[in-house]
Amino acid sequence: MESQQLHQNPHSLHGSAYASVTSKEVPSNQDPLAVSASNLPEFDRDSTKVNSQQETTPGTSAVPENHHHVSPQPASVPPPQNGQYQQHGMMTPNKAMASNWAHYQQPSMMTCSHYQTSPAYYQPDPHYPLPQYIPPLSTSSPDPIDSQNQHSEVPQAETKVRNNVLPPHTLTSEENFSTWVKFYIRFLKNSNLGDIIPNDQGEIKSQMTYEEHAYIYNTFQAFAPFHLLPTWVKQILEINYADILTVLCKSVSKMQTNNQELKDWIALANLEYDGSTSADTFEITVSTIIQRLKENNINVSDRLACQLILKGLSGDFKYLRNQYRTKTNMKLSQLFAEIQLIYDENKIMNLNKPSQYKQHSEYKNVSRTSPNTTNTKVTTRNYHRTNSSKPRAAKAHNIATSSKFSRVNNDHINESTVSSQYLSDDNELSLRPATERI
């Protein structure tokens, strides 16, 4: 009988068993998603506790009981007011999660999601030009839906798109931080954030906004692991974990110091001295460079300093090279004293040169006097000829020509006189005027 009943109504028994199971789990007139946490099984309660501990932080908004249906809200951080950012702080250290970043907040808790998904963080595809983060961060935030559509669409041909901003490489060691921060600052400047980055003098053109602060904060922690940061950077972040601007300011200052060290080494290696400037000025210049290097924990020995100075000596100071060539114990003070001695000797010689030249010029203007006459005639030689004066050769030529001409005239006169006398004596002829013929 029982087997026949089971064979006749197999669905009824299976349906009653299914109904009994479902009646234990969820009431028939209740939404399955509306079950409270108290009615869930134990493994669901444990998962709920774990999720609540990981997702809920101090100062966050209340999460509804139906956590399967509603996603948790990010931490609400009030925007900073007037004043320095290190005084306000974007987040308190209590909000930092216990992870490798002891003093950094997770990027997912920042309220600027569209900056975290910047295309600059992705590897550039040569077949698809990614749009660049060009507009300033201080502008109004775009709609997430529009931004997703904008990233998904291929840019038009007529749209001018600059080259993609390459992100900085990840920091690999504490010693490379000074080099890494240069690439990071260049990355921020290429991202149109140059106005809030300190310049070489440590000055900032404009105060950064909350969104710009969040963007710098997220990019810094993304590419600089905390355990690889230098000690002085960790000390700043322990006071205020979001004070990246102070880190950048001190980094720029240290870069200027490093550049000054390089300039000092170049100046010390290219020293030149020929006596055109005073020896005291040269000594002060060299001593200042050496003292500045010493303040930066770079000691320059006297032997090295003397060798660099001797290499640049020229003129009357050049012979000091041979004098110091065989010396093993070189003293910088002794070298400066010898340079000063040579400079003083040359200075004295230069002062005596004008007086000697004056005596020589007076010797040229010689005064001639005749001892037999009472009236003294002073004749001054004039070495400058006027335009009207003629050279001696021309004068001699004129004199010779005039004397020759006078000699010819005298001979002609004498010949005429002799001939006339000869006629009158021999022939006794007298010259008479011609008579007219009739």
Curated annotation (Swiss-Prot):
The record marks 397-398 as: Cleavage. Keywords: Cytoplasm, RNA-binding, Transposable element. GO terms for molecular function: RNA binding. GO terms for cellular component: cytoplasm. Its main location: cytoplasm. GO terms for biological process: viral translational frameshifting. Residues 295-397 are annotated as: RNA-binding. Pfam families: TYA (PF01021). It comes from the Eukaryota. Residues 1-86, 366-397, 419-438 are annotated as: Disordered. Disulfide bonds: none annotated. It is found in: Cytoplasm. Residues 1-11, 19-39, 49-60 have a biased composition (Polar residues). Residues 369-381 have a biased composition (Low complexity). Retrotransposons are mobile genetic entities that are able to replicate via an RNA intermediate and a reverse transcription step. In contrast to retroviruses, retrotransposons are non-infectious, lack an envelope and remain intracellular. Ty2 retrotransposons belong to the copia elements (pseudoviridae). Homotrimer. The C-terminal RNA-binding region of CA is sufficient for all its nucleocapsid-like chaperone activities. Capsid protein (CA) is the structural component of the virus-like particle (VLP), forming the shell that encapsulates the retrotransposons dimeric RNA genome. The particles are assembled from trimer-clustered units and there are holes in the capsid shells that allow for the diffusion of macromolecules. CA also has nucleocapsid-like chaperone activity, promoting primer tRNA(i)-Met annealing to the multipartite primer-binding site (PBS), dimerization of Ty2 RNA and initiation of reverse transcription. This is Transposon Ty2-GR2 Gag polyprotein. It comes from Saccharomyces cerevisiae (strain ATCC 204508 / S288c). The lineage of its organism: Eukaryota, Fungi, Dikarya, Ascomycota, Saccharomycotina.
